[in-house]
Amino acid sequence: MAESNKEAIDSARSNVFKESESLEGTCAKIGGYDFNNGIDHSKLLKSMVSTGFQASNLGDAMIITNQMLEWRLSHDEVPEHCSEEEKKNRESVKCKIFLGFTSNLISSGVRETICYLAQHRMVDVLVTTTGGIEEDFIKCLASTYKGKFSLPGADLRSKGLNRIGNLIVPNDNYIKFEDWIIPIFDQMLIEQKTQNVLWTPSRMIARLGKEINNETSYLYWAYKNNIPVFCPSITDGSIGDMLYFHSVSNPGPGLVVDIVQDVIAMDNEAVHASPQKTGIIILGGGLPKHHICNANMMRNGADFAVFINTAQEYDGSDSGARPDEAVSWGKISSTGKAVKVHCDATIAFPLLVAETFAVKKEKASKVNGF
């Protein structure tokens, strides 16, 4: 009996104290920022990767984004018989970066972060929903205000106030928007009829960016820096309302916006990216996420991918899908580097930019003496 009891205890001990495989040198050790060392925001952000949970995912997103920014064709194997001139040219070939975001982020203060990226040509292609277009212009005309998530809808409606989460948009803002955009539509219609101008969503957005002529607008900077902005859902929002009112007010064929030309242009951004690598950063889900991923499927997947959203995968939605699902479709390369950060993008994205794009911009400014 004693022997049997000893065997049972030994078995229990071996189960409880199972020998571990060594992780030394293969995994980062978990540890957070030590505030005894003073306040250093850059070191704090760098410490995210070893903090654990979504902080580590955010840290990984910073690393992958910096890899997008640092990659040059010259880093890849140089072909035989490559001339010095070709080698020099390879150094100038950078990763093409696609940035997608949902409209609520332009309603929020993330608009200013995106404006910074467009102003300094840090991204190459932008994709958003209609609200992400109109809210940018509307903010040039009138303000959005901080409210509360709990404000009663019926009470707000009686006051002509619209709620976006805990943001408040006075309905008067849309009246100002109509006063601004309808004369532009009038001129666009004239050009369509007299010059056979073929309007696409991206061409229309560029025209509106030109017309707003306001440096607080990310679409102004996209127009100025020739960054294409794609919005296949251009009629799904206030712009759609304005197109409706404009069309019913004008006899005969109204303004025509061709979305087919834009899907060709969008897919070509990915198809003809080679020999560049492509990187995708997607804030939120829905249309911008799928549109960017689908275009990159045309080249057998993006090389770098960062998703930031709070959507879950359990309902089979594309919004909630993890990067590995995109790999199965060829939307992210099977050899690509990808991460999903489960976080509100209004928190995560400015922090990511602070430790990636903004750092690169600051270093470049010092080198160039600006």
Swiss-Prot record:
Asked whether the keyword Secreted is assigned, the reply is no
The entry's function note states:
Catalyzes the transfer of an aminobutyl unit from spermidine onto putrescine. The resulting polyamine homospermidine is a precursor in the biosynthesis of pyrrolizidine alkaloids.
Which PANTHER family has this protein been placed in?
A: DEOXYHYPUSINE SYNTHASE
Q: Which GO terms describe its molecular function?
A: deoxyhypusine synthase activity; homospermidine synthase (spermidine-specific) activity
Which keywords fit this entry according to its UniProt record? NAD, Transferase
Single GO cellular component term: cytoplasm
Q: What class of enzyme is it?
A: transferase
Q: In which tissues is it expressed?
A: Expressed in roots.
Q: Which reaction does it catalyse?
A: putrescine + spermidine = sym-homospermidine + propane-1,3-diamine
Regarding protein family, the annotation reads:
Belongs to the deoxyhypusine synthase family.
Species in which this protein is naturally found: Senecio vernalis
Q: Provide the record's note on post-translational modification.
A: The N-terminus is blocked.
Please give the name of this protein: Homospermidine synthase 2
